[in-house]
């Protein structure tokens, strides 16, 4: 890997090419690839699970006014503990939790990835193990490795489900400092049954060590009747539930993540957070969005409608899919998912190849974007052959 200076005229500057092997990079980081979905300029981008609905003109105006007000004191450091924002988040979480969430139980940071990083800084590190069950959100593994925490990957069943027995057996075997679960799971999209999370909590409580972290980034999109893991917090002090404002709140550009947990967990994060880590502007934007929660969350039902439309139509093309409680659908199985991905891209539709053989993931976009996806996929699969094992092979030219 060769590094070159970036920016205007960089190619004319006398920078000596430098091989990264010459840098004192930690051995545990060598050979790794950075996280990132392709950022391509195509008409239809359905690969990063963004909410396709931009903020309204009224909300844009409100955010602008809040940012302008924050700018009047930009010479001062922000509220170091983001007390007002955390109080607003606690109020927002209370209905899902089924109990009165208190400010002391909530923490906020720059996106849920910083939340995950702080948890690993506080409870992981050298000589400690983090356990996850793959396929799942790849940043759990990457942040674990970045914090010198050993990563152990447990495996899901062939249909991507996870049973209490599998989870408890893995915890007993590896005695992890942190157990990462996704509900809904990314990339498969299905929420975990509460008994799986409860079993994980009981297992770490039995060992006397470890935390259970449930990543609920897509919780607002879950199907009717599916409870949030927040309801388990009063009974399990070692449980942490993380969320984000990037998805349901359509604030991916603001980078706001948060968690709910026992106050002692929040107190622990004060030890690893950077000073004034959440800017005045970020706090102002997030609080404004929460004040307009009804408007923003009104887009959730529209997104779910397009998700459910995809779920209804894909089986008619011979495809299998995982039940979705998120704003995306995981579908397959293909003999060559990369060829399908490329065919869709050639048609101007970008979906996500997460690297799992035979499967792709598509975000539920606007109606016209879903039209484009379904049309392109139908054309791609024209003449394809479904084998006895259910695997789809594209027609040869």
UniProtKB/Swiss-Prot annotation:
Q: Report the enzyme's class at the first EC level.
A: transferase
GO BP annotation list:
L-histidine biosynthetic process
What positions are modified (N6-(pyridoxal phosphate)lysine)?
Answer: 247
> What GO annotations for molecular function exist for this entry?
histidinol-phosphate transaminase activity; pyridoxal phosphate binding
Checking SUPFAM superfamilies in the record gives:
PLP-dependent transferases
Q: What is its EC number?
A: 2.6.1.9
Q: What keywords is this UniProt entry annotated with?
A: Amino-acid biosynthesis, Aminotransferase, Histidine biosynthesis, Pyridoxal phosphate, Transferase
Q: Reaction catalysed? A: L-histidinol phosphate + 2-oxoglutarate = 3-(imidazol-4-yl)-2-oxopropyl phosphate + L-glutamate
Key word Isomerase present = no
Q: Which NCBIfam families would you find in this protein's record?
A: hisC (TIGR01141), PRK03317.1 (NF002877)
Instruction: List the PANTHER family.
Output: HISTIDINOL-PHOSPHATE AMINOTRANSFERASE (PTHR42885:SF2), HISTIDINOL-PHOSPHATE AMINOTRANSFERASE-RELATED (PTHR42885)
Q: How does it assemble?
A: Homodimer.
Q: What is the name of this protein?
A: Histidinol-phosphate aminotransferase
Species source reads Frankia casuarinae (strain DSM 45818 / CECT 9043 / HFP020203 / CcI3)
**What gene does the UniProt entry assign to this protein?**
hisC
């Amino acid at each position: 890997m060769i590094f070159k200076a970036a920016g205007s005229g960089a190619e004319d500057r006398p920078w000596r090419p430098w091989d990264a092997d010459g840098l004192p990079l930690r051995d545990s980081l060598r050979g790794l690839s950075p996280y990132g979905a392709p950022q391509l300029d195509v008409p239809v981008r359905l690969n990063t699970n963004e909410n396709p609905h931009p903020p309204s003109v009224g909300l844009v105006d409100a955010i602008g006014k809040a940012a302008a007000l924050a700018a009047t004191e930009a010479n001062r450091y922000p509220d170091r503990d983001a007390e007002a924002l955390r109080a607003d988040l606690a109020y927002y979480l209370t209905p899902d939790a089924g109990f009165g969430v208190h400010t002391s139980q909530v923490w906020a940071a720059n996106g849920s990835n910083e939340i995950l990083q702080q948890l690993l800084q506080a409870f992981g590190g050298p000589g400690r193990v983090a356990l996850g069950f793959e396929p799942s959100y790849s940043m759990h593994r990457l942040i674990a490795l970045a914090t010198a925490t050993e990563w152990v990957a447990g495996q899901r069943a062939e249909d991507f489900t996870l049973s209490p027995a599998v989870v408890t057996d893995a915890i007993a075997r590896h005695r992890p400092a942190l157990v990462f679960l996704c509900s809904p799971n990314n990339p498969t999209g299905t929420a975990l049954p509460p008994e799986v999370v409860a079993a994980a909590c009981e297992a770490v409580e039995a060992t006397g060590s470890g935390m259970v972290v449930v990543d609920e980034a897509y919780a607002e999109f879950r199907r009717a009747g599916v409870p949030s893991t927040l309801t388990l917090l009063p009974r399990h002090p070692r449980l942490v539930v993380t969320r984000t404002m990037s998805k349901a709140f359509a604030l991916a550009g603001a980078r706001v993540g948060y968690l709910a947990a026992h106050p002692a967990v929040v107190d622990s994060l004060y030890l690893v957070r950077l000073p004034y880590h959440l800017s005045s502007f970020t706090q102002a934007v997030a609080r404004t969005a929460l004040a307009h929660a009804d408007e923003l969350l009104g887009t959730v039902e529209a997104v779910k409608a397009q998700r459910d439309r995809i779920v209804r139509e894909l089986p008619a093309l011979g495809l299998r899919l995982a039940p979705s409680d998120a704003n995306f659908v995981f579908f397959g199985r293909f003999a060559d998912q990369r060829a399908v991905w490329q065919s869709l891209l050639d048609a101007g539709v970008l979906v996500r190849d997460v690297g799992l053989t035979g499967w792709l993931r598509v975000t539920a976009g606007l109606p016209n974007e879903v039209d484009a996806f379904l049309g392109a996929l139908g054309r791609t699969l024209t003449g394809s052959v479904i084998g006895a094992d259910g695997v789809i092979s594209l027609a040869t030219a």
